[in-house]
Each structure stands twice: as C-alpha cells, then as structure tokens.
Amino acid sequence: RQMCIRDSGKPAKITVNTYTGKQGVVNIEREVDLSGSTHSKGVYILSGYLGELFAQDIPLCLTASICFEQLYNGVDGDSASSTELYGLLSSLSEIPIKQSIAVTGSVNQKGQIQPIGGVNEKIEGYFQICKMRGLDGSHGVMIPVQNVENLQLNDDVVEAVKNNLFHIYAVSTIDEGIEVLTGVPAGKKDKDGKFPAGTVNYLAYEKLKKYAKICEK
C-alpha cells in the first residue's frame, strides 16, 4: 500500500495486489465508474512501463488490481500514477514501502516523473495531518523535481523541514523514488540485461518470471 495526496491536500490510501493472470493492470475505480479519463489513462501507462522494463525476454503474465481505499466520490487526474507504480513494484518485489511518506507525481511510460499542480496545497495538507498526529522525523512528501521551483510553503512547514521533523523529497525517476520509499537500490540492468541481485527490480522481475512459467502450463 502507499499514500498519495489528492488535490484537496487530503491523503488517500492506495493498495495494490499482484497475481498470475493476463488481465494486466486493473483499475478498480474504472470498473465501478469512479475513474475519470485522465486517471484511467495514467493506469494504462503503468503497463507500458512494466512491459518495457521487465518483458523483453518473458511475456508479461500479470494481473494487478489498484484501489483507492474508502474513496467513493470518484478519482481523476494523473498525479497519483507514480504512487500506483510504486505500489506495483512493492507488491511484485515484496519489499514494503515506508507509510510515513506521501507521494504525488505523474509518470510516463519511460519512468520519468512529471510535474503536477497544487504542490504547495498538497504538501501543507499532509503536513497538517502529520503535525496533529505528532511529527517524529519520519514524515515527508515526495514530489516531482520540476515542482521545486513552485514551492512557496508556509513558515510552519519550512521550520519543520529545517529541524528535520518533516522532509520533502524531489525525484525525477521511478528508480529514485522507489529507493527513497524502500531504502533498497532500484537496480539498473547490466550489459547482459540482468538486474543486480537483491534490488527492487531484480525481485520484481523474478516474481514476473514465476508468473510467466505458470501461464505456460
């Protein structure tokens, strides 16, 4: 599971399940008519990313369900697409994600993080919730690096960041983001197209290899 921040500044919990199948990435919100077209497009992009990264020598034999938990008034926009992809990678690799860090940011098929709107409101909204519950130095927000120039945060947030009670992580790729969220290297392919053992991408690929073998039976 992973936390994203909605346009209102309120966090929303996203859960992801992955298992053997051929349906690809299933957007539960879309299945029940709670997903806008922009959000649905963002979910389709995730399959493109997974296919290019992991399915060069094996078929992408995967079913994955993505759900905004306890959200019943609809979802639109693509600012949660990177969050959904982190959830997919976490589920496939079985490496847990830090639940104290909220995420916002769009992603393209190449894994590049793209800017979003309302970055200040999103950070300040999540900060207020963390402050009410008690800041302990583990809380923070991950944003697209392009949005750094848009930051005009209130004094409370700035002071908390200075005192290492709250953190803002600016990332440009999915690989950078998953390392912040898990504390584990993402893993780059070597010249033979293999991921380093123990990395997030290695473990995700190994899981997908198992799925592919099951689908062959």
Label every model-predicted segment.
Residues 12-34, 38-217:
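Peripheral, non-AAA+ core regions of ATP-driven protein-machinery
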Residues 7-11:
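Short, flexible loop/turn motifs enriched in small residues
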Residues 1-5:
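Short, small-residue-biased leader/transition segments that mark boundaries at the very start
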